[in-house]
Amino acid sequence: MTRRPLLILLEFVLITGPLTWWWLHGGLESYYEIFQRLGFPLLAEMGVNTFNPGLVKDRMINFIPFLGLMLVTPGLGFVRRFVGLAVGMLLIFLSHVLLAYWAWASFERDGQAADSMAQFFPGLLLADAFPFIIWAVIANRVLAEMISNIMPRSASSTNSQSD
C-alpha cells in the first residue's frame, strides 16, 4: 500500500515542526558551538581570520528540512536512508563552512563594497537549495518512480508498446 501525499506532508510537518521549535530555542546555539569547534579550524586553514556569524547562522537551519525529507520519503531502504542521513549531514556541515568562507570573501576580505551582497547572494541560494539537492540525489530512484507514475506516457511510447 502506498502512502498518500497528504499523509507524507503531515508526517513531514510532525517531524520538522518540533525540530524547528527546538532549533529556535537552543538548538542553533548548540550547533553553533559545534561549528566553532570543528568549522573554525577549517576556516582558519582557508585563510579566514575574521568571521561575522550573522551572515551565516540563519542558514544553518537547513539540516531540518533535509532530516524531515529523509525520514518521510517512502521506498528508501534502511541502509540508504541511514547512510544518506550521515553523509548528507556531513555535507551540509561542510556547506556551512563553505558559506562562511564565501561570506568572508564577499564582505571581509576585500572590505564591504557596494557589490558585496551581489557576490554573496548566489552562496545564499546554493546554501538554501543544497539540502534538497542532496535529498534528491539520495532518493533519485524513488523520485524517478514517483514521477513516472504521475507523468502521462507520450504517444510514441504508447504506440510502440501496442505494435
Give short role names for the model-derived ranges.
Residues 19-28, 94-106:
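C-terminal TM-helix exit segments that contain a strictly Trp-centered aromatic cap at the helix terminus
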Residues 83-94:
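Central hydrophobic cores of alpha-helical transmembrane segments
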Residues 100-156:
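Alpha-helical transmembrane segments of multi-pass integral membrane proteins
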Residues 14-18, 61-70, 130-136:
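Hydrophobic alpha-helical transmembrane segments of multi-pass integral membrane proteins
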Residues 2-31:
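N-terminal signal-anchor transmembrane alpha helix
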Residues 30-51:
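Extracytosolic (periplasmic/ER-lumenal) interhelical loops and adjacent juxtamembrane/interface segments
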Residues 2-3, 74-84:
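Membrane-interface helix-boundary motifs at transmembrane edges
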Residues 54-78:
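Hydrophobic alpha-helical transmembrane segments
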